[in-house]
């Protein structure tokens, strides 16, 4: 049967199965139980029935488990499924769960052609065995389906049409109005980084300084300081710019937090407990998180620091539980404090302020837009030398260090309370003692959630909080699928999941009308659509929709004869030894993802009779730096190993700038910033825990003319950082002139970066991602570049036969 593209939203309900052991099949379950008892040795067998929904081989929904109901299991569960899949059938599978794996009972097939017209269908569908024959007793499953094509969505490709746009639907947190947002590029912005970027209303864009603001927020807190992190390192200092000193700025963050706790401030920290059983990755040079040191530092002090493992929700199998607790992390990076009212005028009243983004408060994160490799080794980075990509790298052997590019945000107003509530949910689940600040008792002091801007303030923001998290990490999630759905949560096989970050990305991409700009540490997913010549797609499981949504958006614009551009910035390779099998495996997934997208774009261009370069619509970059030697530079006492990547990079005076960002800008009007990568770990909801904000300024929308608010100013400031220049064409990123200009500059910078010799510093950091695109969209090596410069690491990656995909996707 021909496969048809389902691109839109599928509403599905699974009601029940009738008479599972009818027609003489009564011994079916007893045989099943006996078999399980023999293989697993668990005593008397118990049936644990659940049903799943697949679009071909892509799992898009699953019910809870119903125990000991062998004849007529009733789930009555509804699903809201975003889809971008080629499929001939919507497949309902009934299974009996085992401690290890599950036993197939049968599958029911609904042809995609039946739902295409958008009418609701409600029917009993025959359950078939693996040979497509009816199972014993002729059992049927009762389902309801209704498909809403993306073209019928009134927001499709129309941007945010009105200041009253209500935000992403079906989410745990609703959108908040009357908020303030500060956007941060890198941990610090020095005074000499001042691009002139005019905004609406005659203002110029002003940069903010993340770690200075976090230092001030912690220093001035009086009642509470809540921190979550993948890593928090007590030995780092937040203030390092000698031209911008602050009182107390020489303290480490550990000493600062101890001091605040001793003053009576409630300081609570949830730091990921790195269960070192992830040895597979550890030896490949992934950075230690200092979790044990951090806990030790605060032991027997007034700071409550809890090491927080990524515990599974209650409903998984033995294998799933093992995977979650040993392979996945707590990845949210937030700081929540109480703060003085703006322009407080001597008032004792306090409000809540929160920070959300990609920056952990740990070593290797402090950097500026200049991302120097060698010139800060005797100043800001002498005691914070971070280079996990070379074995044995150390300050004593010299640079290049690994520069760090990241993005963060500060949110004020009602949205800041949502971040606080997220912390409280997590603390109640895994924090141990109930020592959260008693907000009810403090209501005379801390004002309740309320707008911090007037409705007519042109700088106001509407902001929504999104997460990837499940009931294993957040307290108070509903128990039943019905209540979960009402709360904007997804129910799975006995776990309740908040997957709203993925939903937010999907909605923003579907709304986009002109361009999308992405910076992310990873870029892989939509594995259901990868080329499957040498892999079994269904075994990969990187099913999130983001890459496919991007390519389908471009395709729709090509078909409509309209311009659209997608710019993606990723690191050269994921942090770690680049030749290692884990890094090579991730690069292989990334290549397959990019290739899938380019094939979609090329196919659409060819269908229009165009042989245009697909890079005019979709283009990938990385960041790097290269510096000539200057007199007075730090001189290391030792040398790197001869003929090592380290030694070659030191001689060539170049290295990648690590892109750790997790950000997307749409049409210069909407921005998502958070901790979530574009991979399955971050977008799944039941893997790594994540948090993000999505927001826009209702007075700065891209309706009749291009948006010129803070989001535009921030993007232009980022482009100034990466390109070393501003140009008029950058104001219209969707235009062919702009994407050609950016591609040309990035191609030139790559040539300078990768050349044998260097006459002067690299004029900018944005480099072409070193891959080619062949005539049918296949991703190929750039001529002469099988390996990243100074390494023996293949740019296109390599399949890892012994690493399970769940670890690297």
Curated annotation (Swiss-Prot):
Membrane keyword on record: no
Alphabetically ordered keywords of this record: Calcium, Hydrolase, Lipid degradation, Lipid metabolism, Metal-binding, Repeat
Ranges where the C2 domain occurs: 1-125
Binding-site list for a 1,2-diacyl-sn-glycero-3-phosphate: 331, 521, 660
GO cellular component, one term: plasma membrane
Cofactor needs: Ca(2+)
Presence of keyword Hydrolase: yes
Binding locations of Ca(2+): 186, 371, 405, 721
Reactions catalysed according to its record: a 1,2-diacyl-sn-glycero-3-phosphocholine + H2O = a 1,2-diacyl-sn-glycero-3-phosphate + choline + H(+)
Cited InterPro entries: C2_dom (IPR000008), C2_domain_sf (IPR035892), PLipase_D/transphosphatidylase (IPR001736), PLipase_D_C (IPR024632), PLipase_D_fam (IPR015679), PLipase_D_pln (IPR011402)
Source organism, top-level taxon: Eukaryota
UniProt-listed GO biological process terms: phosphatidylcholine metabolic process; phospholipid catabolic process
Physiological role: Hydrolyzes glycerol-phospholipids at the terminal phosphodiesteric bond. Plays an important role in various cellular processes.
Protein name per the record: Phospholipase D alpha 1
Originating species: Vigna unguiculata
């Amino acid at each position: 049967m021909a496969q048809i593209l389902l691109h839109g939203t599928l509403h599905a309900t699974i009601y029940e199965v009738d008479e599972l052991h009818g027609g003489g099949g009564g011994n079916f379950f007893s045989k099943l139980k006996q078999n399980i008892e023999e293989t697993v040795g668990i005593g008397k067998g118990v049936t644990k029935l659940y049903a799943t929904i697949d679009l071909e081989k892509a799992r898009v929904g699953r019910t809870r488990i119903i125990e000991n109901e062998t004849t007529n299991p009733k789930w009555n569960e509804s699903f809201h499924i975003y889809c971008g899949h080629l499929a001939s059938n919507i497949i309902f599978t009934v299974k009996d769960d085992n401690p290890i794996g599950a036993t197939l009972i049968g599958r029911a097939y609904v042809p995609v052609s039946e739902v295409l017209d958008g009418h609701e269908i409600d029917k009993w569908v025959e359950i078939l065995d693996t040979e497509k024959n009816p199972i014993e007793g002729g059992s049927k499953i009762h389902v309801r389906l209704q498909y809403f094509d993306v073209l019928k969505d009134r927001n499709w490709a129309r941007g945010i049409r009105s200041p009253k746009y209500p935000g992403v639907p079906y989410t745990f947190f609703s959108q908040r109005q009357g908020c303030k947002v500060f956007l941060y590029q890198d941990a610090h912005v020095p005074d000499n980084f001042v691009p002139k970027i005019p905004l609406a209303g005659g203002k110029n864009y002003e940069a903010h300084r993340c770690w200075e603001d976090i230092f001030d927020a912690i220093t001035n807190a009086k009642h509470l300081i809540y921190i979550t992190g993948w890593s928090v390192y007590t030995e780092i200092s937040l203030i390092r710019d000698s031209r911008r000193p602050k009182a107390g700025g020489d303290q480490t963050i550990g000493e600062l937090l101890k001091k605040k706790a001793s003053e009576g401030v409630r300081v609570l920290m949830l730091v990921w407990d790195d269960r070192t059983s992830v040895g597979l990755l550890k030896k490949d040079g992934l950075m230690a998180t200092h979790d044990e040191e951090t806990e030790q530092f605060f032991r027997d002090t007034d700071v409550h620091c809890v090491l927080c493992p990524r515990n599974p929700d209650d409903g998984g199998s033995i294998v799933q539980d093992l995977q979650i607790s040993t392979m996945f992390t707590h990845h949210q990076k937030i700081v929540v404090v109480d703060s003085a009212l703006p322009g407080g005028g001597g008032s004792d009243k306090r409000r809540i302020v929160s920070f959300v983004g990609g920056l952990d408060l740990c070593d290797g994160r402090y950097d500026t837009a200049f991302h120097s490799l060698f010139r800060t080794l005797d100043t800001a980075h002498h005691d914070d030398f971070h280079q996990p990509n070379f074995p044995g790298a150390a300050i004593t052997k010299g640079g290049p260090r690994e520069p760090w590019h990241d993005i963060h945000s500060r949110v004020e107003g009602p949205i800041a309370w949502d971040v606080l509530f997220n912390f409280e949910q997590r603390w109640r689940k895994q924090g141990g003692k109930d020592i959260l600040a008693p907000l009810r008792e403090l209501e005379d002091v801390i004002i309740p959630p309320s707008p911090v801007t007037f409705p007519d303030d042109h700088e106001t923001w509407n902001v929504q909080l999104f997460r990837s998290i499940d009931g294993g990490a957040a307290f108070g999630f509903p128990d039943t699928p019905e209540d979960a759905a009402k709360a904007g949560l997804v129910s799975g096989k006995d776990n309740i999941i908040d997957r709203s970050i993925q939903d937010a990305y999907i909605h923003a991409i579907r709304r986009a009308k002109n361009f999308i700009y992405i910076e992310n540490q990873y870029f892989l997913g939509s594995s259901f659509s990868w080329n499957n010549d040498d892999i079994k797609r269904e075994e990969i499981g990187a099913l999130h929709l983001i890459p496919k949504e991007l390519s389908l958006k471009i395709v729709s614009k090509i078909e409509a004869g309209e311009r659209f551009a997608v710019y993606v910035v990723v690191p050269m390779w994921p942090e770690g030894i680049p030749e290692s099998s884990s890094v090579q495996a991730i690069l292989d997934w990334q290549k397959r993802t990019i290739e899938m997208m380019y094939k979609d774009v090329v196919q659409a261009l060819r269908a229009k009779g165009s042989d245009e370069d697909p890079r005019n619509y979709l283009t990938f970059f990385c960041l790097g730096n290269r510096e000539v030697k200057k007199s007075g530079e730090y001189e290391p006492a030792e040398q790197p190993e001869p003929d090592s990547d380290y030694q070659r990079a030191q001689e060539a005076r170049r290295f990648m700038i690590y892109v750790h960002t997790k950000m997307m800008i749409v049409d210069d009007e909407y921005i998502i910033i958070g901790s979530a990568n574009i991979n399955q770990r971050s977008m799944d909801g039941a893997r790594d825990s994540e948090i993000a904000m999505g927001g826009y300024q209702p007075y700065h929308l891209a309706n009749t003319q291009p948006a010129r608010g803070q989001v535009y100013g921030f993007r232009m400031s980022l482009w100034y950082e990466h390109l070393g220049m501003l140009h008029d064409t950058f104001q219209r990123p969707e235009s062919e002139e702009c994407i050609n200009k950016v591609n040309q500059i990035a191609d030139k910078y790559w040539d300078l970066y990768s050349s044998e010799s260097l006459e002067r510093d690299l004029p900018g950091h944005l480099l072409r991602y070193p891959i080619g695109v062949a005539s049918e969209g296949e991703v190929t090596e750039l001529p002469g570049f099988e390996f990243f410069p100074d390494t023996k690491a293949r740019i296109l990656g390599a399949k890892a036969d012994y690493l399970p995909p769940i670890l690297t996707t």
